[in-house]
Amino acid sequence: MRRIRIFDTTLRDGEQTPGVNLNIQEKVDIAKQLARLGVDVIEPGFPLTSPGDFEAVQRIAREVEGPYICGFSRAIIRDIDETWKAIKDAQKKCFHIFISSSDIQIKHQLGKTEKDVLEIVKSTVYHAKQYTDEVEYSPMDASRTRLEFLYEVIEAAIDNGATVINIPDTVGYATPIEFGELIQKIRKNVRNIDKAIISVHCHNDLGMAVANSIVAAMNGAQQIECTINGVGERAGNAALEEVVTHIAARKDYLGFETGIDLSQLYKTSKIVSRYMGIPIPVNKPIVGKNVFTHESGIHQDGVLKERSTYEVIDPRLVGRDDSVILLGKHSGRHALKVEAEKLGYDLDEERLNKLFNDFKKLTDVKKNVTTADLESLIIESAAKAVEEAYVLEKIRVVSGNIETPSAKVVIKDSKGNLLEAEQTGNGPVDAVFKAINSVIKETENLTLYKYSVSAVTEEMESLGEVSVTLREKEKLYTGIGTHTDIITSSAIAYIDAINKAIAANARAQKN
């Protein structure tokens, strides 16, 4: 059976989702989970975007084993040299070189000609090949590129060392039949295409990313590029969990398979959702809350008699296990560490100590702590992997329908000083945020960009998880807070986002 390689770009293309700004520890955690999932290639970021991105790619290259770690680079010699410094320590490494190839992008974005682009591709692919055996080349906007030029530039890339040719539908313009025919034409008209793997990278602007990816594979593509939960710019990318589950469910018809451990899908989806602060829609295929829920009486009757009557896959196949492990106030550090490892988190001593303290605080207000609660605490801990300039010490809120909501906060700064403030607002959360703003001077240039709330479990005493994104000019900072009291969660998340903004500005000044 033909094997399709899975190239994950959650940490590069996926992180370009508006409002997403992962810290280094979050990126490392996601990369390690992608390795457990079994992806063939991880594109961990764009190293030259910032010193933080460079460090994240470098750490992933050093710490993550199994998949290829792919360095994403513009078709510029000096960029390739610098990108190599970020990926060189990886067990398995490769390059991904890209440049626009469509008439509209060559003319209006690059200000060049097709001849210019052809020469750039030859020289940069050859240069990258001097560093590593595997080099991927992407003619960006391939689905809108003049076919004769597309064939020519692909041939030139392969002649100069490219081992993977990626065909991007950059703006999600193609339809499935059309995209499948494009792959066929490339296989037929590119003289040396047998010397390279054909990859596809589909965007979802017209809702066809997964369909285009599957049809491309049916027509000979050997690698599919995708992201967890379909995250990415604009309408996102092909959703990895949908692509690989479709291949697994219909391998009898499709005749190919992947190396993905499907049982890790749901866990990976949740980690990415929480770190990025993007809730999973309830009807999202494979990982949405309602996907295996049956409301119709006829459907319920059928599922009770035989699950396959209305479920095309067993939920357990993709890691949708409803079993719950309960921890309580008498649970020790070892039990906590074991459960964290079962969830896929390898915690060092510092992170374990922090988690244990947070866990003990939670058991004071919640009798039983579930695996979902524990995972939420771990994710919140990773989200706070920056030096905390401010920490919430106390909070008191007065609210109701007969008086103006007010909030009092006590915040400790990095020097141990306690800062107090009380404010009223248009609701308790607004009052809390105004109180925080009144004592933290660094909030002057920050504005609220996004606020979302979700319950970690469905119990009455469930942890409430809040994601707050703040904007400072063109930069976005996302904080996460969890607590059984949603107002407290909001305050924690708000201060977390502020701390990230402060840390980012400090790094920028240092550099």
Swiss-Prot record:
It comes from the Bacteria. SMART domains: LeuA_dimer. It catalyses: 3-methyl-2-oxobutanoate + acetyl-CoA + H2O = (2S)-2-isopropylmalate + CoA + H(+). It is found in: Cytoplasm. Residues 4-266 form the Pyruvate carboxyltransferase domain. Keywords: Amino-acid biosynthesis, Branched-chain amino acid biosynthesis, Cytoplasm, Leucine biosynthesis, Manganese, Metal-binding, Transferase. InterPro entries: 2-IPM_HCS-like, 2-isopropylmalate_synth_dimer, AIPM/Hcit_synth_CS, Aldolase_TIM, LeuA/HCS_post-cat, LeuA_allosteric_dom_sf, LeuA_bact_synth, PYR_CT. NCBIfam families: leuA_bact, PRK00915.1-3. Homodimer. PANTHER family: 2-ISOPROPYLMALATE SYNTHASE 1, CHLOROPLASTIC-RELATED, HOMOCITRATE SYNTHASE-RELATED. Belongs to the alpha-IPM synthase/homocitrate synthase family. LeuA type 1 subfamily. This is 2-isopropylmalate synthase.
